[in-house]
């Protein structure tokens, strides 16, 4: 008996060591990839003092950690879905014994823990540390900046906890719930993270439909469009003449007229960009022009249509079946049954749709006017803007598993703290979320595909000069002689 107990303890010990090793290796890979992504966009700093260089380096490491956690949260649900199918297909395979329910539950718990840590501690610390200068009267240095940062963090924590305490007390006036608020770890922080998750899902609800319609424009800019009834040689000739004319103007302007020089340089950059695109289209092969672009557009349309159909079916399931709710539906467990009707093919389709929704949400996020200034630029993004981008991506990625389960994209149950959010058990919130997503996505797609017809109707009616087009982003501005902007 003692030998058996020792053997069981050894197996548990080796299993835990193996899980920690796998988690560490996965996170190390994500951290390295995140570091290269951030350094690609981070502004190359000029010669700085040692103190500022250390502060920037610490903020960079914290931002990289947050971006790695965001990537882990995005991969969480796809990894769990594919792991469930692998365990069903090869239940006794020796080489996949490391892949088990304990590992997957541990990954979900770590993702939840690190998301809370980054959102409430690391990112506020990085921002305040970057902006701090030290209190007046204290000796300047790293210690003074750390002290100021810690004080700001304590004040921020008191403010946020006080707001959540008042909000929860107003929502639920029960005495028992008031007393439970004093239990910080068991109630307060999960309640706060539940609110953040709800905000993230609402942000996804706003960004994803916009991104789904915007994806067609983005892919159209990245791919080479078919040259139907277009003479690229003539366009190249015209662009070359424009470039030469602007270059002659720049050479003839004196150095004292700085405003005109700056405007002409901007026009020259735009012309060069158009010329580069035309050269790329001219060099593209026939199959790239005539096959790749239509195939990608059709693929995007199919993925978007499947997403909307799945949401529509999920609405019907919610009305007739209580197990369709994202909270409280006890699943069969990992490796016990397939959660997709079509088995491995259905699981692969779910994973593709989850990644597609995440990419669309990011595209939609940066397409919103309020977040346009957040768009990172290569080698020209400040550290403050990088922190803002990391926080935004973290909120979106942390809410992605919740949104995917709420919309019925997958039937995989949310594990860890992701499945304990109170609002997931509210039928009216979940149903309203599905209805709003389906309606907003449909409206955005209809608006996208009917914009060309609408513009032609406005031109035919002579109303195109009234600027009724609802796509001001695509219009170009040109300065007039009196300094005002004219829309072309």
UniProtKB/Swiss-Prot annotation:
List the record's Gene Ontology CC terms alphabetically: plasma membrane
Cytoplasmic topological domain: 40-61, 131-150, 208-295, 360-382, 447-488
- Compartmental location: Membrane
Q: Which stretches face the Extracellular side? A: 1-18, 83-109, 172-186, 317-338, 404-425
The alphabetized list of GO BP terms reads:
signal transduction
**Keywords of this entry:** Coiled coil, Membrane, Receptor, Transmembrane, Transmembrane helix
**Coiled coil spans:** 246-286
Q: How does it sit in the membrane?
A: Multi-pass membrane protein
Q: What is its main location?
A: membrane
Q: In which tissues is it expressed?
A: Detected ubiquitously at low levels throughout the developing embryo. Present initially in the limb mesoderm as the limb bud emerges from the body wall and up-regulated along the posterior margin of the developing limb bud with progression of the limb outgrowth. Higher levels are detected in limb buds, otic vesicles and pharyngeal arches. Isoform 1 is detected in lung, spleen, heart, breast muscle, cartilage and liver of the adult tissues. Isoform 3 is detected in adult lung, spleen, heart and breast muscle but not detected in cartilage and liver.
Segments spanning the bilayer are 19-39, 62-82, 110-130, 151-171, 187-207, 296-316, 339-359, 383-403, 426-446
UniProt cross-references to InterPro entries, sorted A to Z? LIMR, LMBR1-like_membr_prot
> Any keyword Disulfide bond?
no
Gene Ontology terms, MF aspect? transmembrane signaling receptor activity
Give the signal peptide, or none: none
Job description of the protein: Putative membrane receptor.
Return the similarity comment: Belongs to the LIMR family.
Listed PANTHER family: LIMB REGION 1 PROTEIN HOMOLOG, LIPOCALIN-1 INTERACTING MEMBRANE RECEPTOR LIMR
Q: What is this protein called?
A: Limb region 1 protein homolog
């Amino acid at each position: 008996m003692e030998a058996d107990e020792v053997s069981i303890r050894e197996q548990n010990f080796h299993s835990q060591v193996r899980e920690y090793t796998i988690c560490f290796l996965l996170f190390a890979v994500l951290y390295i990839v995140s570091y290269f992504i951030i350094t690609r966009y981070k502004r190359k700093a000029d010669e700085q003092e040692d103190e500022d260089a250390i502060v920037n380096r610490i903020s960079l490491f914290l931002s990289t950690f947050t971006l790695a956690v965001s990537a882990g949260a995005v991969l969480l649900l796809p990894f769990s879905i594919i792991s469930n199918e692998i365990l069903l297909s090869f239940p006794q395979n020796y080489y996949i014994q490391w892949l088990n329910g304990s590992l997957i539950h541990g990954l979900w718990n770590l993702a939840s823990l690190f998301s809370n840590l980054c959102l409430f501690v690391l990112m506020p610390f990085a921002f305040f540390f970057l902006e701090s200068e030290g209190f007046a009267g204290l000796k300047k240095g790293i210690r003074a900046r750390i002290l100021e940062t810690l004080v700001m963090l304590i004040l921020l924590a008191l403010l946020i906890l006080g707001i959540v305490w008042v909000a929860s007390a107003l929502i639920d006036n029960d005495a028992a719930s008031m007393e439970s608020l004093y239990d910080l770890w068991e109630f307060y922080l999960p309640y706060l993270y539940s609110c953040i998750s709800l905000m993230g899902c609402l942000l996804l609800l706003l960004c994803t439909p916009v991104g789904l319609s915007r994806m067609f424009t983005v892919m159209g800019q990245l791919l080479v469009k078919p040259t139907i009834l277009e003479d690229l040689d003539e366009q190249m000739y015209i662009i070359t003449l424009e470039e030469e004319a602007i270059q002659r103007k720049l050479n003839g302007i004196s150095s004292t007229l700085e405003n005109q020089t700056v405007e002409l340089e901007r026009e020259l950059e735009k012309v060069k960009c158009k010329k580069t695109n035309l050269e790329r289209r001219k060099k593209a092969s026939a199959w790239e022009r005539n096959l790749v672009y239509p195939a990608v557009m059709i693929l995007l349309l199919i993925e978007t249509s499947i997403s909307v159909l799945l949401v529509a079916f999920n609405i019907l399931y919610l009305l007739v079946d209580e197990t369709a709710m994202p909270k409280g539906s006890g699943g069969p467990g990992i490796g016990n049954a397939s959660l997709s009707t079509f088995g491995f093919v259905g699981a692969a389709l779910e994973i593709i749709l989850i990644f597609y929704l995440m990419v669309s949400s990011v595209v939609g996020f940066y397409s919103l006017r309020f977040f346009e200034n957040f768009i990172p630029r290569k080698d020209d993004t400040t550290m403050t803007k990088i922190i803002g981008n990391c926080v935004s991506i973290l909120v979106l990625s942390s809410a992605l598993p919740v949104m995917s389960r709420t919309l019925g994209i997958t039937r995989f149950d949310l594990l860890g703290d992701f499945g304990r959010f109170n609002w997931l058990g509210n039928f009216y919130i979940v149903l309203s979320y599905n209805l709003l997503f389906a309606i907003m996505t449909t409206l955005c797609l209809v608006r996208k595909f009917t914009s060309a017809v609408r513009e032609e109707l406005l031109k035919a009616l002579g109303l195109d000069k009234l600027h009724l087009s609802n796509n001001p982003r695509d219009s170009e501005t040109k300065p007039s002689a009196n300094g005002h902007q004219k829309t072309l």
